[in-house]
Swiss-Prot record:
InterPro entries: GP_PDE_dom, PLC-like_Pdiesterase_TIM-brl
Protein name, per record: Glycerophosphodiester phosphodiesterase
SUPFAM superfamilies in the record: PLC-like phosphodiesterases
Biological process according to GO: lipid metabolic process
EC number of this enzyme: 3.1.4.46
Catalytic activity: a sn-glycero-3-phosphodiester + H2O = an alcohol + sn-glycerol 3-phosphate + H(+); sn-glycerol 3-phosphocholine + H2O = sn-glycerol 3-phosphate + choline + H(+)
Alphabetic keyword roster: Calcium, Hydrolase, Magnesium, Metal-binding
Family: Belongs to the glycerophosphoryl diester phosphodiesterase family.
Domain spans labelled GP-PDE: 3-239
PANTHER family: GLYCEROPHOSPHODIESTER PHOSPHODIESTERASE, CYTOPLASMIC, GLYCEROPHOSPHORYL DIESTER PHOSPHODIESTERASE
Effect on the protein upon substituting H50A: Retains 1.39% of activity
Sequence positions that bind Ca(2+): E35, D37, E110
Gene for this chain: UgpQ
Length: 243
């Protein structure tokens, strides 16, 4: 079975992360899907940005939660990446869904609900997914497993993926207990026991964030189901060559 190529925040190696331009580029390259992050604005809109503050990726300063949608849309999310990307904006989740349309394309949505908690984000996300008919094309992931538990309670049919960083023992048991579709470990944790345990128990495995060619080759050889990477072009070429 082919290893899925999931572009982390889009083609974030070459284009400003979590922007429409980055997602469009990932689609043009032939990625199987994208990974993106959602947070809530002050007035309750789902916006796509990784950090809890806008400082690193835009020309603004402050917490995402303190901006209204109108205010956050005035920020330049491309200028720090280079002049040619000036004018890129922080997209809403709806705008990303509109870009993808009815294409057979995976969207891994990470709920950012840790440093800043966003009460009600799960309900808003589920509503957006249903509204745009993305139920079969999304995996909702988070480091906050309470948030994922809430998603599963409200929408049992949606796929969830458990994000984690440390070397957990037999984590597929936790995945099965939570009725999770997948595990999303930091790629250093990929060992034969983990791959075998997941395969035996029907749990998909999507390690992150794999950017070096030699690590991509190791992940493909290990037999993971998909790879989350900042460099989708290199990974696509490797997968096409058979690893």
């Amino acid at each position: 079975m082919k290893t899925l190529v999931i572009a982390h925040r889009g083609d974030s190696k070459n284009v400003p992360e979590n922007t429409i331009a980055a997602f469009k580029r990932a689609m043009e390259l032939g990625a199987d899907g994208i990974e993106l992050d959602v947070q809530l604005t002050k007035d309750g809109h789902l916006v796509v940005i990784h950090d809890e503050t806008v400082d690193r990726t835009t020309n603004g300063e402050g917490f995402v939660k303190d901006f209204t949608l109108e205010e956050i849309k005035k920020l330049d999310a491309g200028i720090k990446f280079g002049e040619k990307f000036a004018g890129e904006r922080i997209p809403t989740l709806y705008e990303v869904f509109e870009l993808i349309g009815d294409k057979d394309f995976l969207v891994n949505i990470e709920i950012k609900s840790g440093i800043v908690l966003y009460p009600g984000i799960e309900e808003k996300l589920i509503k957006a997914i249903k509204e745009y008919n993305f139920e079969e094309r999304v995996i909702i992931s988070s480091f906050n497993h309470y948030s994922l538990r809430d998603v599963k309670k409200m929408a049992p049919h949606l796929k969830i993926g458990l994000l984690y960083q440390c070397g957990l023992v037999e984590p597929w048991h936790m995945a099965l207990r939570m009725e999770a579709y997948s595990l999303h470990p930091f790629y250093f944790n990929i060992i034969p026991e983990l791959v075998e345990g997941c395969k035996k128990n029907g749990v998909k495995l999507f390690p992150w964030t794999v950017d070096r060619k030699e690590d991509m080759e190791r992940m493909i050889k290990a037999g993971v189901d998909g790879i989350i990477t900042d460099d989708p072009e290199t990974l696509i070429n490797l997968v096409r060559k058979g690893g």
